[in-house]
Amino acid sequence: DVIPDGPTTPEIAYQMVKDETFAQTQPRLNLATFVTTWMDDYATKLMNEAININYIDETEYPRIAVMNAKCINIMANLWNSPEQAQWKAGALAIGSSEACMLGGVAAWLRWRERRLAQGKPVDKPNFVISAGFQVVWEKFAQLWQIEMRQVPLTQEHITLDPQDALKMCDENTICIVPIQGVTWTGLNDDVEALDKALDAYNAKTGYDIPIHVDAASGGFILPF
């Protein structure tokens, strides 16, 4: 666990990594994975040729920034975004975990801004999610010190039950997180039913609790 005194040849370094990872699960046999396990040769070629490009540097790589914006537009149009702007609002993420982090932070900041404007405390935020969450939500709760309230999954309710979720909400709830492709079962939480129930709840309580949909694996399927 220390930096070696001398260099290692590329061949040996390669073999060391191959040997270290040999016994672990092969990606194509991992039914729990959320990533692509096979790509066309041209996709692999493009990735290899772009491996040294720091795409976040839009000044030096402006065409990649345009391509990113086009991808956001495609997603916005797919989901019938009402935005009229040429370039729709959105953000790119390396994977679903980063997307969850960004969505959670956005919900927390909106809640915090609203509470501060009302002169109310902001020290006890929480969010509501089913017990079938992916692990990034636990990390989000730990990193940002936000209470995670878990709605149990039962034989009667094998996806997020809207009424059970609402029972866990209060004025400090930054959002409710339905999941599309629950890790345990692959099933989808009913976003439409939750949205209707939450609209009624917000109207009754005066709260403004939003929904953040964790698209997970279901986000690749539901639009089609």
Language model feature labels by segment:
Residues 55-63, 88-95, 125, 182, ...:
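Conserved aromatic-histidine-acidic binding/catalytic patches
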Residues 75-103, 151:
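Short loop-beta-helix segment that forms the pyridoxal 5′-phosphate
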Residues 95-224:
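Conserved PLP-enzyme active-site core in the AAT-like
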